[in-house]
Amino acid sequence: MSENIPDIDPNELLPNAPGQHQDLGVDNPPEPDNASIRAERGSPTPSSVTVDNAPSLPDRSFSHLPINDPFSGEIPEVPIPSSAISISSQALSDPVPTPSDTSRPGILRNDEQGSTSSHPVDPQEPNEVNNEYLAHLLDLGFDEYTAVLALKRTNSAGVEQAVAWIVERSNESDFDEDSSSSENEADEEMGAVQSVAGRTHKMVLVANMSLKMGTGKIAAQVGHATLGVYRQAMNSENGQNAIAAWTRHGQVKIVVKGQSTEQLMDLCKVAKDAGCYYYLVQDAGYTQIPAGSRTVLGIFGTVEQVDSVTGGLKLL
């Protein structure tokens, strides 16, 4: 038995399918109109500006503006006060200060020092020494450095004052006519002298660091100072007793730093006033330093005496 199958039109099954000769442009729809979309949403439509409808800007050039010449007319004269005229004339009449007057602020000229009483000039140490006094000191055998230093410290008061200043700060043996008069006393044995019980002694040697001596040079000068102090102490009975006590307690020796030749000479006087034995070495000048330089000061005595002189100095 055969069934009758009805004929089916393909176009009825696919009504939206495009035909064979249908325009394919419908598959690519055009871009949506943004203006219509903004109108639906309530958004304002931006206005387009072209070259033709652009608004004209104001002309900002100043070429058409007139410029007045400030120097075209007459300049008005400004009256000058009479006080200014008097000041200018006085300034022209005053002398111009010389460089020597203005190079050192606060220092008045010689003619102004006597007339100015409200602001007196402080006394200053003279920079130059009296050449006549210096020549006398050199004739007496003092070296130039010591002579100049003595004249400065005594304000060039005179030769006697300078000599006294040097003597107070030097070895007594430097001015003795016969420095070997105590050689027989030095031959005595130290063990034969009884020391004072309970006394502790020490020796301090002050090196002059301003001379820039080497290590070996300082060691040699310290040896000279130690021997010099020892000889000075052995010249008296009290010194021999002190040396004996010092020997029994280990012969304490301490080397400290001195700042300058002037400090060593001042310490020499302080040691003399304190009752210590002292010796200031003057180098012969064969190596490193000039002849006559004060290199090392040796001080010997009781602990209390020596500490009162060199207690503030630092160890070398």
UniProtKB/Swiss-Prot annotation:
EC number of this enzyme: 3.1.1.29
Biased composition (Polar residues): 44-53
Keyword NAD tagged: no
Reaction it catalyzes: an N-acyl-L-alpha-aminoacyl-tRNA + H2O = an N-acyl-L-amino acid + a tRNA + H(+)
Pfam families per UniProt: PTH2, UBA_7
Purpose of the protein: The natural substrate for this enzyme may be peptidyl-tRNAs which drop off the ribosome during protein synthesis.
Protein name: Probable peptidyl-tRNA hydrolase 2
Lineage, top ranks: Eukaryota, Metazoa, Ecdysozoa, Nematoda, Chromadorea
